[in-house]
A protein has these predicted regions:
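Positively charged n-region of N-terminal signal peptides that target proteins for export
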Residues: 1-7, 20-21
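Hydrophobic helical h-region of N-terminal Sec-dependent signal peptides
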Residues: 8-13, 78
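C-terminal motif of bacterial Sec signal peptides marking the signal peptidase cleavage site
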Residues: 14-18
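Short, compositionally biased
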Residues: 19-129, 201-215
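Terminal interaction module
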Residues: 26-27, 103, 107, 163-171, ...
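Short hydrophobic beta-strand that contains or immediately precedes a catalytic carboxylate
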Residues: 75, 135-136
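An exposed tryptophan-centered "aromatic clamp" motif
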Residues: 119-132, 138-191
Length: 215
């Protein structure tokens, strides 16, 4: 009986020690300013080099809305050189023309399917790592504008093109056509001020592709 009590006491001591022991578990949840790599993995910036990965984009938004597709958005490290939204005047690209919809991916596919959008073609041509990049909608690029100051440091650390505040370098195409003027104009967005501008679609402007994450 004494031996039984001794064994029971030993088990209780082990159990209490296990419960009281503090353990730090790594926080693996995706966060703003994490890095999307060419293998599709999202890691902390500090882990890019140690894991031998190649960065391609920076996470700028984590989705909290179940009605929004994906778990977040990442912005590509580099700008695409200025291209026209459309090389033909008077043609609709059949985007939603909604400035509140998070539908840049669908808009970009509509632009590309028209066969008349140099901007969309340039984005499709950059899919060298299997990442489905697209031109952000007005609603999506507004999210990027809100996170610009945070992600710019990491874009720079990864060797990318920092999002400029210079008036002559801050304007980017969105994938959203202007409602009731779809055949002539699309929205241009300033990542310096957050301003929107109706712009003739044949004008060349820079593009900053983004990607929807499903991590």
């Amino acid at each position: 009986m004494k031996l039984l009590y001794t064994i029971c006491a030993a088990f209780m001591l082990v159990a209490m020690t296990s419960c009281d022991e503090h353990r730090d578990f790594p926080d693996t949840a995706m966060k703003t300013c994490d890095i999307l790599c060419t293998d599709g993995k999202v890691v902390r910036y500090e882990d890019v080099k140690s894991q031998g990965k190649k960065p391609i984009a920076v996470v700028f938004h984590i989705n909290q809305n179940n009605g929004t597709q994906g778990t977040g958005y990442a912005v590509y490290l580099w700008d695409i050189a200025p291209e026209a939204y459309s090389d033909s005047i008077g043609v609709k690209q059949n985007t939603s023309a909604s400035i509140t919809a998070f539908d840049g991916n669908m808009n970009t596919h509509s632009m590309y399917s028209s066969g008349l959008s140099p901007a969309a073609t340039s984005v499709f041509d950059m899919w060298q790592y299997g990442q489905s990049a697209y031109i952000p909608s007005v609603a999506e690029i507004r999210l990027l504008y809100g996170a610009k100051n945070s992600v710019n440091d990491y874009i720079k650390k990864c060797g990318g093109d920092v999002i400029s505040d210079k008036p002559e370098e801050c304007w980017y195409w969105t994938s959203t056509e202007v409602k009731d003027m779809e055949s002539a104009k699309a929205w241009l967005f300033s990542l310096a001020s957050g301003a929107l501008q109706e712009t003739p679609k044949e004008q060349p402007h820079k593009i900053r592709p983004i990607i929807t994450l499903y991590n």
